[in-house]
Every structure is written in C-alpha cells, then in structure tokens.
Amino acid sequence: MFSDIEIARQAKLRKISEIAAELGLNEDSITLYGQYKAKIDLNANPQLQAQPDGKLILVTAISPSPAGEGKTTTTVGLGDALQRMGKRAVICLREPSMGPVFGMKGGAAGGGYAQVVPMEDINLHFTGDFASIALAHNLLAAMIDNHIHHGNALQIDPRQVTWKRVIDMNDRALRQVVIGLGGKVNGQPREDGFDIVVASEVMAVFCLADSLKDLRTRLGRIVVGYTYSGQPVTAQDLKAHGAMTVLLKDAIKPNLVQTLEHTPALLHGGPFANIAHGCNSVIATRTALKLGDYVVTEAGFGADLGAEKFIDIKCRKAGLHPDACVIVATIRALKYHGGADVSALSREDMLALDRGIANLEKHVENVTTHYGMPAVIALNRFDHDTEAELALVMKRMGEMGIKVVVAEHWAKGGAGAESLAAHVLQLIEGRSEGVRYVYESSETLWEKVNQVARKIYGAMDVHAPRPVRAMIDRLQDAGYGHYPICIAKTQYSFSTDASRRGVPHEHILTVRAVRLCAGAEFVVIICDDIMTMPGLPEEPCAIRMDIDDDGQVVGLY
C-alpha cells in the first residue's frame, strides 16, 4: 500500500478553474493561487445567493484513541461517494495547523484514497490564512504594549492584560514568558505568554463572521484587558481593529481545492475543538450550501466537543440546520475505550469491545437526543477487525435503532463509502424536526456549564474555585450572560481526566479558568490542565520530514 503522500502525488488533478466553473463560479469570482488552489470572492456570482440552500451533513466521532479514527477521511470519502452517485456535493473542512503537522499528527488532509489535494500545500502554509490570522492577532498585542509604553492614556493595568501572543507551532517553552526586559527603551516588563494560533480569538472571530464588515465589528469588540478601575479595554479602544481587518481582507475568502476524485472542497479556518469551537468558517459553509445540493462538513474530535460546539455556537449564531449526522468509530478505538492496551488493539478482544461500545452509545445518545439529529455509524474497517467484533457492534447499535455501515473509503475512495452515502440520503429524506440546543441563551453562564457537563459529559457536578466562579458571575452581571459557552477540555475522555476511558461515572467537571471572547461572542470555560499552547511529543513528526534531491517533501505522512 502506498503512503498518503505517494497516493496524493500519483493523482491527476484538474485545474481548479474547471472545478470552480462546474460550481457556477466564473473567472471573476475566484483568485487563483497556482493551478490547483483558489480563493472564492465574497461577492461571487450574486445570482447564487438566490439559490436554495443544500442539505448539511455533519461528520463527528466517538472519543478518539491516540491513533485517531479517520473523521476527515470519512468526510472526504462521503463527499466523493455522493458525487459518484450523481449528487452535487461540496466538502467543507478546516485548514490544518502546522503545530500538529510537525507534532503528533503529521498531515491532516484525509488519508489513503480519500484525501484533499494538493496535500503538501494544504499541510504547509496553504494560502497563508493562518499567517494572516497570527499577524492580525500579534499586531493587536504589539499595539497594547506600545500604548502602555507611550503614556497609557487608556490606563491599561499591565497586570490585567489578557491578550497573549500566538504562533502556529507547538512550543511549551512559550506558555509563560516575561516581556519588556532590558531597560525602559524596551517597554514595561510584565508577564505574558503564547497560545497556538488556532486558540486565538481572532481565529474564532474569523470563523464566525459572516462578512468583511461583520469581521471588522467583531474584531473591534475583542477585550484585551482591563483598566486600573476594572473597565474592559477593547481593540476598538486601541484603534487596532481596522488594521487587523486589512491583514485579513484576503484570508477571509474561502479556499477552494479538490479531492482525489475531483469533488470540490472548501477549506477555511481551523480552530481546535478541545481549546476552541472546532468548526470551519461560517462564510465557507454558507458558500458551500449555495454551491452544492449536499454539503459534508466535520466538527473537531468527538461528538461531546466539536459537535456540541457546532450546534450550540456555530449553528445557533449562523442559523444553520444540519440534516443528518455521521458518527465515525473504529473497532480498535472501542476496544481502547474498553480498557485494552494500545499494543493489543489489533487482537480480537470481545470483552474490551463490549465494554468500549458504551462510549459509542453515549455519543449516539448525545447526537440523537440532545442535538436532535438523525445518525448513522460509519465504522472504518481495518484488516484485523474480525466478523465477531463487527457483529457485536451492529447488534448493540441495532438495539438503539441505529444503522452501522462498514466504510472502506480509505482503501477504495468514494466507491467504499457509497453504502454510507445511501443511508445518509435516507436519513435526510426522513428528517422531520429541527436541531436542538443543549441549553437556552436565556440561561445563566453557570447554568449552561452545568447543562453541558451533566447532559453531554455525564458529570455528576461542576466545581470552580471561588475566584473563577466570581469571574463567571462578573461576566454574567456585565451583560455577557446570553453568550454561548465554549468548554476547553481534553478530547480523550468525557471527563477532564484523559486517562478515564469509555464512559466515566461520578466524575466532576472542574473549571480552572474563564476567558471572555467578546468578539467571537462566547465565553471559554477552561477545565483542569488543558493547554492553549500544546507541546511537541518525545518524537515529533518533524523528525522524519525532509527534502530529497529532487526537491520533494518526504515524511509528511
């Protein structure tokens, strides 16, 4: 079997202008970035806006094992399958962050014969959107310290500056730093730190804005810190939001690429789902819904994280209504959640599998009962999966009235996902009710945390230190109580302890910190030891990457 990068290099790509033309986009509606990448103008073909929206399909997953379950691969495979069946399909994905690319994950553009291409470009810089977002974020950071240095007319308290700097890399050494050392000429010394760019509020604003004007307004509302008297200071107070918008004027346009089977794919934005809201941009999703009859998108990590935020933040804000949900699972991950050791996941273990299916059952309950979406299970099959194991999963899901479809798109491309696509179409045809939210906007922030913790995570209680609870109450009293919440926690467990697999019982959600995102219009609830700046693993993927004598990238995936 060829590696992902070898498969991608063997592909015969079509010019992206041809893909755009088939979507109804003329040459004036796109900006080419070479032959195989383009950006779609925000005012592309005004007549498209009169088109009815297509059907929206969400792909999510169970709580991931360390190896991942193939959610992006399934999203691509399903889109290809729909296209093969004569449907006008468009795929919507997030852009990869280079932190995980060089860290633990490697490439993030699908896998096997279900990939988006050009794979190397997508994983390495792409069209420069993340660099633009980082520049806009760090411009604001520079203007904060510059304002303090030149007289501090706004009376910003350096001890209460909440706006960190960002880079698109995993670097634990930058989590806490001291800036302004070396004398008066270098500014006022204060504690600072770095987040990874996908955790930036600018990224969240970028992905939730519905126009360039809305982007500018949201950027202006970003709270960067507080004055000595406790009043919030915004990017607009610093007159930074206009220049920030200038840096993002091209990045805000959705990126158009293609799959190995030439299905159009829009990749735009990339917030993580464990430390941010985990969805691609509203602009890209809305554009895709006008261009295609069926739009396949994903939300990061498991259905407890990305899917919850997709529903409670993105869909609520943008007025989106998903028509069906695909929950991705693997036999090996279910055995992992049943207590099997990572080294033993390729061996049949009916006992571990039986226990681990509880994790899938909880995600099914969340999707169907709490989010109100009809669901199907896409079981990504591996060679070592046995018939007995497959039969057990199908039996347990059948008892819940949920169909399990064995998916083989990794090995067979769209042809391996046609059965999955056919069942998704059946779910859409039988759709009769709208999406449900986990909580109402009218509930208090603390009530919202409790709703998600108890309903979605199965927690028995929520705890927060007194200063954190006081900050939540302060935000409530300041008029931010109607905002949705964005819980930052580990992706590996329903609890805040990554080692507690399956469906932990009697666990408590512990809130460590809270962060206001007034531009994105949500409140981040940070739990336990989750980090907004990841670190590299002991053996990062960067170790195996290189350039050969022909200038070809090796070891990317």
UniProtKB/Swiss-Prot annotation:
SUPFAM superfamilies: P-loop containing nucleoside triphosphate hydrolases (SSF52540). InterPro entries: Formate_THF_ligase, Formate_THF_ligase_CS, P-loop_NTPase. Belongs to the formate--tetrahydrofolate ligase family. It catalyses: (6S)-5,6,7,8-tetrahydrofolate + formate + ATP = (6R)-10-formyltetrahydrofolate + ADP + phosphate. Pathway: One-carbon metabolism; tetrahydrofolate interconversion. It is an enzyme of class 6 (ligase). The keyword Protein transport does not apply. CDD domains: FTHFS (cd00477). Keywords: ATP-binding, Ligase, Nucleotide-binding, One-carbon metabolism. Its EC number is 6.3.4.3. GO terms for molecular function: ATP binding; formate-tetrahydrofolate ligase activity. HAMAP family: FTHFS. This is Formate--tetrahydrofolate ligase. One of its GO terms (biological process) is tetrahydrofolate interconversion. ATP binds at S65, P66, A67, G68, E69, G70, K71, T72. Gene3D superfamilies: Domain 2, N(10)-formyltetrahydrofolate synthetase, Formyltetrahydrofolate synthetase, domain 3, P-loop containing nucleotide triphosphate hydrolases.
